[in-house]
Amino acid sequence: MEEFQRYFELNRYQQHNFLYPLIFQEYIAALAHDHGLNRSILLENTGYGNKFSLLSVKRLITQMYQQNHLIISANDSSQNQFFGHNKNLYSQMISEGFAVIVEIPFSLRLRSSLEGKEIVKSQNLQSIHSIFPFLEDKFLHLNYVLDILIPYPIHLEILVQTLRHWVKDASSLHLLRFFLHEYRNWNSLITPKKTSSSFSKRNQRLFFFLYNSHVCEYESIFIFILSQSSHLRSTSSGALLERIYFYGKIEHSVEVFAKDFPSILCLLKDPFIHYLRYQGKSILASKGTPLLMNKWKYYLVNSWQCHFYVWSQSRRIYINQLSNHFLDFLGYLSSVRLNPSMVRSQMLENSFLIDNAIKKFETIVPIIPLIGSLAKAKFCNVLGHPISKPVWADLSDSDIIDRFGRICRNLSHYHSGSSKKKSLYRIKYILRLSCARTLARKHKSTVRAFLKMKRVGSELLEKFFTEEEQVFSLTFPRVSSTSTSRGLYRRRIWYLDIICINDLANHE
């Protein structure tokens, strides 16, 4: 119990008293304006150690500004909203600048938590594909899964309370309240099916940071219970646990929680349990019984409502059996299927037939939502029939082919982990024919006549069929034989360099 209480001690020495003056510096506005900022820069600045003072934050921001050479050219003024007359311009710049500032201490803590760990390349943990090998390895031995829709706070002030115990600058907190009340429908960021305003689209960085910080508050205690009740230990989860910090609102819940911890641990004892979170959903998979999963379900609901001021209902958590359920997340439909097989056993004069079912983890590309995304982007109709892209007809032939080829390669790269490539081949066919029809529309010809053109037709085929195989051969240079290469190409391949979901792949 002493170890448990020490685990929940607050880190009050890491308090930044005056962040407000930094927001209005010129280099902050430049950093906030650069939407292509490489966040790995925050982890590559090694000269500051564990110093979380205002001066170190300011030096880091200055260094980031100098490294990226974010000089706004006057030539871009006609095309860039930075110089436009938008009523939300200044609130956008300031909110993005605020997000840049508050992200730096968290990035420094992440780097310090990874030091000394057996993680060679921590950036691989940031890849979206890194979760699928974990599922493939672990879910074969599990039976049930909880599909959880993460609740959102009942009041915007709760998001401010998340930061107020390490940011003592009242001006910054008042400014944060201004952003939150200007955008009242902030929870539509977490539930993408709802409509969102233009302000939300320009300030997603700040809102996602606040939302993740708030989720980590109550998620931390939950993960701690999992680590104590399970026999499993993971280096990656250990590193993630150390980057979580607990604030004032948890003090009361910790006091109550510490008294009931032995009974809770006994109630929810499960030697094999796994947890993962993505966007506004999370998954809790277990080898236990439906009764145990119901206990977890009602414990989560009561914990959210009683201790963290988060409104939730039991109907937002679904209990499903892995063998009869598809996990719909991150652009894939994942499931655990039983492959039946029959073995004949011969003993002396008698023979027996033995049924042997083998579990197999499958990941499938959901073709219908993906075709819907292509139809929304005007590459095909709702039935999946390719159509031309009129808005690109004014571009050069090479630019049109490059754009279609880039989309096709990105989708193939992201969905390379699919167990069945048939759906992916159909998507490539739609894009290829849409490209041909766009070029034929530009040249006022038919698709058949256009494809007979030797130069353009061969270039089109080369873009869509040979370039992907060239990238594959560069990824696996030791694969020499053609048959071996084709067999490996048909298998699931997970890449550890994918840190964002393609817009066409994100159909949730």
From Swiss-Prot:
Domain of life assignment: Eukaryota
Protein location: Plastid, Chloroplast
A Pfam family this chain is assigned to: Intron_maturas2
Example GO BP: RNA splicing
GO CC terms, sorted: chloroplast
InterPro entries membership: Domain_X, Maturase_MatK, Maturase_MatK_N
GO molecular function: RNA binding
Keywords, sorted A to Z: Chloroplast, mRNA processing, Plastid, RNA-binding, tRNA processing
The keyword RNA-binding appears for this protein: yes
Family: Belongs to the intron maturase 2 family. MatK subfamily.
Function: Usually encoded in the trnK tRNA gene intron. Probably assists in splicing its own and other chloroplast group II introns.
Protein name per UniProt: Maturase K
Organism: Huidobria chilensis (Loasa chilensis)
